[in-house]
Amino acid sequence: MIALIQRVSEAAVKVDGEVTGEINQGLLILLGVEREDDEAKAKRLMERVLTYRVFEDQDGKMNLNVQQVNGSVLVVSQFTLPADTKKGTRPGFSKGAHPVDAERLYDYFSDLCEEKLHTQRGRFAADMKVSLVNDGPVTFWLQV
């Protein structure tokens, strides 16, 4: 399971022109589910993301996590993250989870986040328009 996290001052996702989720300070989490992923991996990744120290303390060092700054998360499914890009000029998607499994684990991950802090979501498998202001920019690839 892969999370591409971006520290944002604001982020929003729209489906068919309607806002389905938006946050101010926090993390935009683009979530990719791989074939071998399960609930244990989803929980481990959620714990890692929510405790990953990407926010600055009073000394300007990245020592605080999203929970410590009372931030929010916006979770957006991103089936392209597990793509195989090693050869050619077209990505392969055989490493991605089956859509039914991917949706179940996306929902599970998002539900776990909701238990910890303010969480907004995109809509699984929808054509989404994601807007954000990346603060930094600060972006990290986390994988379990």
Curated annotation (Swiss-Prot):
GO biological-process terms attached to the record: D-amino acid catabolic process
Keywords: Cytoplasm, Hydrolase, RNA-binding, tRNA-binding
Subcellular location(s) per record: Cytoplasm
Disulphide bond pairs: none
Keyword Hydrolase: yes
EC number(s) given by UniProt: 3.1.1.96
Record keyword NADP present: no
Catalyses which reaction(s): glycyl-tRNA(Ala) + H2O = tRNA(Ala) + glycine + H(+); a D-aminoacyl-tRNA + H2O = a tRNA + a D-alpha-amino acid + H(+)
One GO cellular component term noted in the UniProt record for this chain: cytoplasm
Role description: An aminoacyl-tRNA editing enzyme that deacylates mischarged D-aminoacyl-tRNAs. Also deacylates mischarged glycyl-tRNA(Ala), protecting cells against glycine mischarging by AlaRS. Acts via tRNA-based rather than protein-based catalysis; rejects L-amino acids rather than detecting D-amino acids in the active site. By recycling D-aminoacyl-tRNA to D-amino acids and free tRNA molecules, this enzyme counteracts the toxicity associated with the formation of D-aminoacyl-tRNA entities in vivo and helps enforce protein L-homochirality.
UniProt note: domains: A Gly-cisPro motif from one monomer fits into the active site of the other monomer to allow specific chiral rejection of L-amino acids.
Family: Belongs to the DTD family.
Name assigned to this protein: D-aminoacyl-tRNA deacylase
Species assigned in the record: Aliivibrio fischeri (strain ATCC 700601 / ES114) (Vibrio fischeri)
